[in-house]
From Swiss-Prot:
This is Probable pyridoxal 5'-phosphate synthase subunit pdx-1. The lineage of its organism: Eukaryota, Fungi, Dikarya, Ascomycota, Pezizomycotina. Its EC number is 4.3.3.6. GO terms for biological process: amino acid metabolic process; pyridoxal phosphate biosynthetic process; pyridoxine biosynthetic process. Gene3D superfamilies: Aldolase class I (3.20.20.70).
C-alpha cells in the first residue's frame, strides 16, 4: 500500500515513462565498481545498476542490506556515460531522496534490499526521478504504477541464477492481462471493475492495460537471469529488456571473461528470436555461475515475497 493518496501527476509521469521507453530492447547490468561499469558500457549495456554487493553476495552475507554508499555511486556515475540506477529499500523515502539528490537516472525500490517499511511502499509520484519496481503479478505491477513507477520488472529470485521464478512472474502477468482483456470484451467496465477489486488494482489502470494488451509502462525481466538463453527466453515471453545481476561478474575469471559474458547477453537480447545468433552467444558466454536452485530454498530465504 502507499503512504499517501495523492494522484499521479500526468505530465511528469509521461516524461518518466518516456525515458524508460528509451531502454527497450536493452540489458541493464549490476555493477559494484567503476571498472565493472566500464565493462558493462563497453559490452553494450543500456544502463547499469550501482550497488555495493551483487544479489548473490547479499544472500551469502545475510544481515541487513541497505542503500549503497553515495561515494561508490558517484564513482560509477563518473565512470560511464550510460544511465546509472541505484537501489533503495522498500518504503525508505529518505534513501530515495538521497539517491535523487545524487542525480541517479532511475531509483529501484527493491526487494533485494531489506525492507524498511512492512506496510507502505514509497509514493513515487512525489519524486522527479523515475522509479523501477518489481512485481510477481498484475496486481503488484499496477499498484506500483499507481504509486508512480515508470518501469516494472519481474521480481524473480535475485542472486540465484535460477530463472524459474522470473518465468513464473512474467507468465502470471501475461495471463492476468489476457484475463483483463477478456473481461473488458465480455463484460465491459463492470467486469474490469470486479477484476480490479479482486487483484487490488486501480480500475482505470486495469482498463488501460486491457485495452493495450500489455502494461502501460516498460516491463523488464529480472531475478535469476544468468545466461544468454535465459535472457532470450524472457524476451520470448514479451519482456521489453533484461536486468542481469550476478550472472555477469560472479565467478568471472578475468575482466576479459566478464566482458565476454556481458557481450553475449547483450547479443542474445538483441537477437532473441535468431537461434543461430543465440548459439553463438551461448558459446561466447561460456560457463555460467553455479547458482542456487529455487526448489531447495526456505521461505525466509526468498526475496520475491518482500513487498505487497
Amino acid at each position: 500500500m502507499t503512504s499517501t493518496s495523492t494522484t499521479t501527476n500526468g505530465d511528469s509521469f509521461t516524461v518518466k515513462a518516456g525515458l524508460a521507453q528509451m531502454l527497450k530492447g536493452g540489458v541493464i547490468m549490476d555493477v559494484t565498481t567503476p571498472a565493472e561499469a566500464r565493462i558493462a558500457e563497453e559490452a553494450g549495456a543500456c544502463a547499469v545498476m550501482a550497488l555495493e554487493r551483487i544479489p548473490s553476495d547479499i544472500r551469502a552475507a545475510g544481515g541487513v542490506a541497505r542503500m549503497s554508499n553515495p561515494s561508490m555511486i558517484k564513482e560509477i556515475q563518473a565512470a560511464v556515460t550510460i544511465p546509472v540506477m541505484a537501489k533503495a529499500r522498500i518504503g525508505h523515502v529518505t534513501e530515495c531522496r538521497i539517491l535523487e539528490q545524487l542525480g541517479v537516472d532511475y531509483i529501484d525500490e527493491s526487494e533485494v534490499l531489506t525492507p524498511a517499511d512492512d506496510t507502505y511502499h514509497v509514493q513515487k509520484d512525489q519524486f522527479k526521478a523515475p522509479f523501477v519496481c518489481g512485481c510477481r503479478n498484475l496486481g503488484e505491477a499496477l499498484r506500483r504504477i499507481k504509486e508512480g513507477a515508470a518501469m516494472i520488472r519481474t521480481k524473480g529470485e535475485a542472486g540465484t541464477g535460477d530463472v524459474v521464478e522470473a518465468v513464473k512472474h512474467i507468465r502470471t502477468v501475461n495471463a492476468e492481462i489476457a484475463q483483463a482483456k477478456a473481461a473488458l470484451a465480455s463484460g465491459g467496465e463492470l467486469a474490469v471493475a470486479k477484476m480490479a477489486r479482486e487483484i487490488g488494482a486501480d480500475v482505470e489502470l486495469l482498463k488501460k492495460t486491457a485495452e493495450l494488451g500489455r502494461l502501460p509502462v516498460v516491463n523488464f525481466a529480472a531475478g535469476g537471469v544468468a545466461t544468454p538463453a535465459d535472457a532470450a527466453l524472457m524476451m520470448e515471453f514479451g519482456c521489453d529488456g533484461v536486468f542481469v545481476g550476478s550472472g555477469i561478474f560472479k565467478d568471472a575469471k578475468t575482466p576479459e571473461h566478464a566482458l565476454q559474458r556481458a557481450r553475449a547477453v547483450v547479443k542474445a537480447v538483441a537477437n532473441w528470436n535468431d537461434y543461430g545468433a543465440l548459439v553463438e552467444a551461448c558459446i561466447e558466454h561460456g560457463e555460467a555461475m553455479k547458482g542456487i536452485s529455487n526448489a531447495g530454498m526456505k521461505p525466509e530465504e526468498r526475496m520475491a515475497g518482500r513487498g505487497w
